[in-house]
Amino acid sequence: MKNYLDNINKAFESRARLGIMSVLMVEEKVDFNTLKENLQLTDGNLASHLRALEEAQYIQVEKQFVGRKPKTTYQATESGKTAFHEHLDALEQLILNNRKDE
């Protein structure tokens, strides 16, 4: 019997990272404050999850100044998009297989 959990990507196990990638799959670029408001996360919590996704090379970070204010934006990389689609496919397959057993 195949273990369907093998295809679940650990980088997307948390609700926060799943939310971050979901937003970035819909929007090309999103700034820190927009992610924070939409996902209802604290600055520190969001920053740590963004850092983990950046280290996995699933997101790209762009820092710039708008006037005198810093602005950080995030976007999903191609490898991040691929990994996220594969994760969603694995979840879907897991759900479908569990429904067959009912």
Write out the residue ranges for each language-model feature.
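Amphipathic alpha-helical dimerization/coiled-coil segments
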Residues: 2-5, 22, 81-102
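N-terminal helix-turn-helix DNA-binding core of bacterial DNA-binding proteins
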Residues: 3, 7-45, 66-67, 73
